[in-house]
Amino acid sequence: MPSSEHSFISVPHDALRSVRSFLAFFSKSFNRDQVLLSAGSLAFQTLLSIVPLMAVILSVLSVSPVFDSFKQYVEEFIFQNFLPASGVEVQEYLWQFISKTSSVPTIGGLSLFIIALFLISTIDHTLNRIWGVDAPRKFFQGFTLYWTVLTLGPIFIGSSLVATSYVWYNFFTQGALADVQAKTLLLLPVMNTFLAFFLLYILVPNRKVKFVHAFSGAILATLLFEFSKRWFAFYVSHVATFEHIYGALSVIPLLFFWIYLIWVVALSGAEFVYCLGVVHPERAVVREFHPLLGISAVLLVIERISAAQSSGGFLTMNTLEDLCRSVTRMQLRRITDFLLQQNIIHKTEEGSFALSADLHTLTLYDLYAILPADLVQPKDPETSDSHFGQDLSGLEQNIIQCLQHAMHQPLAAFLNTATRTL
């Protein structure tokens, strides 16, 4: 009976602890990757590239006479799904700009295509940086991918509209199925938004992303996106600050602000998907006390970086993961963040890791004394009662003195000895 009661209580406790751990890691990852700053950078580049990008998409559709009649539907598809209800004025301005691109000469048209490629490349690099993929794609691989997106993407949308229209008007326009058509049309923008986020999260990262993680992230991003659309429409309708300040030019800051919100939502969803892949629920198991728990993983990371630097090279996060397979990706990020914060290592201009501290003067105890709580044995809150304060304080001093004596050796000497025994 006591055991069943204990299991009944521990399950919610473990679930709550896992949620707290996930939210804490998500918050750190969100701030470390500078999501808000990256969203602003992408919003600015998108604002400059949106007209060239739309011009390229419509020009690709104009190549085939089959899709030429669907250009209007593609326009409506994009604006109905990715602009709030108050975006009619924005739509009119954009189509005025896009219509003028048809008279651009060949060299100008090529520059529009290059600008659109740069936008897709920036999106690719920003998302992959969240997954810790610092090394860019090879030129030919990246160019082929971006070219495929720009050319086959519009054709895919056009083909989908052709097929959907055929099924719609042949099977869903009569009888009881007409009600199904009406209800489905209401959900279609949400479904399209979900599909766009899902494909973004599962295809763009140069890492294997689980289907369920991308699916969950797309659901979260879609909910945030729909909330943002309604909030933005309310803001524009009731708080007309931009119109009072900018007048007729208010469409530009409004469009920029809306694009910024889109990228905040998209990158937040990407961070959520990444965290789902690296954070695993912790099980409450009884472990033997190990006073040096956690320091071995930190020493392994330092040793790998030191060995590479001694050979004249530096390690990226990807290479470090391959060399430290016994360390989880989440723990490795925590360790590198800790070492960077303590100036034991630093990042080169290329984003690789290099040593900053002198391992001949930094001792094991120096390292152990500054290890954060999430890298060592967690304390049991039930044993922190002040009633045992004096006894525990004396015991702690004895342990510290023993550790100082036993660990008073430079890291370089310890790592050299450990390497020779391997």
UniProtKB/Swiss-Prot annotation:
It comes from the Bacteria. It comes from Prosthecochloris aestuarii (strain DSM 271 / SK 413). This is UPF0761 membrane protein Paes_1471. It is found in: Cell inner membrane. The chain crosses the membrane at residues 47-67, 103-123, 143-163, 185-205, 208-228, 247-267. It is a multi-pass membrane protein. The keyword Transmembrane applies. GO terms for cellular component: plasma membrane. Belongs to the UPF0761 family. Keywords: Cell inner membrane, Cell membrane, Membrane, Transmembrane, Transmembrane helix.
